[in-house]
């Protein structure tokens, strides 16, 4: 059918890049959502093995979908190479977060926990950092990102030697801050057509 045929406009093939850009953005958003749900479980009062294992699976599935959509985008015409290079770096940091979540899931299953107050403070910082990254993906112009500048510096959350769980959380926060910076740069080079310009993303529940 005509809808399935790519068409050229000004020397650029549009169909696949426009659909793939929207999918890449959606999958990046969904990966962050899965990360958030996992961290909530890990830092909950009484994390249970089955929900932890299920959410770890969802985190890995979401990242794999993101990785696959990036690979597809890199093979298609019409994409800005600088944008793709930035997104590849973003996805690399996402993979590091997956590895930290995998390790923290094991710790939580072994009942390696933080004090309730410290867990709550880390959860708040992680959620703010995750939401900043999601907002960077959701809004159409740099001035509408709704960035929250109340992210507590990770090093102020604890004093003295850090537990293994805290070290993982610190690194997650570091990756999220880097991802926000990367996507702010990539935003100026994003595709300016098609599905990418859908104003708000649908939310996928994990």
Task: List PLM regions with ranges.
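Pore- and pathway-forming membrane helices of multi-pass small-molecule/ion transporters and channels
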Residues: 1-17
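Long, hydrophobic alpha-helical segments that serve as membrane-spanning/inserting helices
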Residues: 22-87, 105-206
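Membrane-proximal, non-transmembrane interaction modules
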Residues: 92-100, 170, 206
């Amino acid at each position: 059918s005509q809808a399935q045929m790519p068409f050229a406009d000004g020397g650029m093939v549009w169909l696949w890049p426009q659909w793939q850009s929207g999918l890449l953005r959606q999958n990046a958003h969904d990966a962050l959502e899965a990360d958030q749900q996992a961290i909530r479980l890990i830092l909950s009062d009484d994390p249970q093995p089955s929900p932890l294992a299920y959410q770890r699976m969802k985190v890995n599935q979401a990242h794999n979908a993101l990785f696959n959509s990036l690979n597809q985008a890199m093979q298609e015409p019409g994409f800005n190479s600088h944008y793709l290079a930035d997104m590849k770096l973003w996805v690399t940091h996402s993979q590091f977060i997956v590895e930290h979540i995998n390790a923290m899931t094991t710790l939580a299953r072994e009942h390696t926990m933080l004090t309730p107050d410290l867990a709550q403070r880390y959860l708040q910082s992680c959620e703010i950092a995750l939401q900043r990254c999601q907002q960077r993906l959701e809004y159409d112009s740099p001035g509408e990102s709704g960035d929250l500048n109340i992210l507590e510096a990770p090093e102020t959350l604890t004093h003295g030697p850090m537990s293994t769980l805290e070290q993982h959380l610190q690194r997650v926060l570091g990756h999220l801050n880097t991802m926000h910076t990367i996507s702010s740069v990539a935003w100026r080079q994003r595709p300016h057509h098609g599905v990418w310009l859908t104003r708000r993303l649908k939310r996928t529940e994990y």
